[in-house]
Amino acid sequence: MALTQERKTQLIQEFRTHENDTGSPEVQIAILTENINNLNGHLRTHKKDHHSRRGLLKMVGQRRNLLTYLREADVQRYRSVVDRLGLRR
């Protein structure tokens, strides 16, 4: 299922760093994580959907790059995002 506008707004409000923030790494990582989780559920039922699998791998790579950037820029913000999203178990 695609990410609804309400859920996206909710994620932005939860992870933003200031009032008008929609593009900070934290927000982007949260939205990508939500999309990745949704696509994982889709791929569990549609195992042969290789086009979607390629999109999933692209999103995972993009999230990894954003996490690397955030870790190098500010370790505290990185740890906060990882803990809040439940990544890196």
Curated annotation (Swiss-Prot):
Gene3D superfamilies attached to this UniProt entry: 6.10.250.3130, S15/NS1, RNA-binding
Entry-linked Pfam families: Ribosomal_S15
Example GO BP: translation
A cellular component term, taken from the record's GO annotations: cytosolic small ribosomal subunit
Record has GTP-binding as a keyword: no
PROSITE patterns: RIBOSOMAL_S15
Disulfide cysteine pairs (residue numbers): none
Entry coiled-coil feature ranges: none
Stored HAMAP family: Ribosomal_uS15_B
Record family assignment: Belongs to the universal ribosomal protein uS15 family.
Protein name: Small ribosomal subunit protein uS15
Classification of source organism: Bacteria, Bacillati, Bacillota, Bacilli, Bacillales
Name of the gene: rpsO
